[in-house]
Amino acid sequence: MGRRSSDTEEESRSKRKKKHRRRSSSSSSSDSRTYSRKKGGRKSRSKSRSWSRDLQPRSHSYDRRRRHRSSSSSSYGSRRKRSRSRSRGRGKSYRVQRSRSKSRTRRSRSRPRLRSHSRSSERSSHRRTRSRSRDRERRKGRDKEKREKEKDKGKDKELHNIKRGESGNIKAGLEHLPPAEQAKARLQLVLEAAAKADEALKAKERNEEEAKRRKEEDQATLVEQVKRVKEIEAIESDSFVQQTFRSSKEVKKSVEPSEVKQATSTSGPASAVADPPSTEKEIDPTSIPTAIKYQDDNSLAHPNLFIEKADAEEKWFKRLIALRQERLMGSPVA
């Protein structure tokens, strides 16, 4: 049983080897032909040797060698098949990764060379871009100036044409009229033009006056600001002493009677006798009202309703006379 199993194994191995040889011979047929032409003598010798070996009876050692070779070749074929199946199992992802790594290595190798060679070209291109940008800016500025000049010229032409058209229209409108009416119409036009010119001058004067007022107000505000800053500095200083408050109205009142006294001293003694010196009336703090007082007598009607008829008529006549005087003289009613 052991011999039969070994024979079957040997037969299967020999079959596999023959198949492998056929495949290898079909793939390398072209190479073998060229090689056979060059070295025909050697092939003939090897063939004769192989024929002699086949004719001779095979020994036991030869069979052993063949078995060993077939086993080694079969193990090599199985290894190759396994490696192929593994590579197929890896699939496209492995190939893509390998191609990417190769491309990266190529780029990394090629970059320093490009940098070393392209420094001068980068400088020249940078200079060119600078000069081009400057030229573009200059062209844009020139184009803007030309457009502005063309606009100004167009406006001047339009105004000139309008004036010419107005004068032509006036002449065409006055041709059919008699000379007296033409003179009147021209006078009216001249007066209208003068009125327009006066209005324009007045508007200019108003604008100038407003500008002056604004300047004066700004100056006044500046002076007030400076004064305020100085007062704040004086208050914040160490030498500041607190004083009682005095309103500006009281200061003005005290200044006015002093001026009156000076005028009386300059005038004669007769005026001094005629006009006695004015004395200020001191105001009592108790007389200053601190609250509003209402006159409520708990009455339902106004007291004027309880006046007699004659008194009411007299008051009404007096009111009418006052209103009439206001209308005639323009004086307000007291």
Curated annotation (Swiss-Prot):
GO terms for cellular component: cytoplasm; nuclear speck; nucleus. InterPro entries: SRRP53. Phosphorylated. It is found in: Nucleus; Nucleus speckle; Cytoplasm. Residues 1-179, 201-220, 243-290 are annotated as: Disordered. Widely expressed. Expressed in brain, spinal cord, cerebellum. One of its GO terms (biological process) is nucleocytoplasmic transport. Keywords: Coiled coil, Cytoplasm, Disease variant, Intellectual disability, mRNA processing, mRNA splicing, Nucleus, Phosphoprotein. The keyword Signal does not apply. Residues 14-24, 35-50, 78-118 have a biased composition (Basic residues). Interacts (via Arg/Ser-rich domain) with LUC7L3, RBM39 and RSF1. Has a role in alternative splicing and transcription regulation. Involved in both constitutive and alternative pre-mRNA splicing. May have a role in the recognition of the 3' splice site during the second step of splicing. It is linked to Intellectual developmental disorder, autosomal recessive 70: A form of intellectual disability, a disorder characterized by significantly below average general intellectual functioning associated with impairments in adaptive behavior and manifested during the developmental period. MRT70 patients manifest impaired intellectual development, mild facial dysmorphism, febrile seizures, and behavioral abnormalities. This is Serine/Arginine-related protein 53.
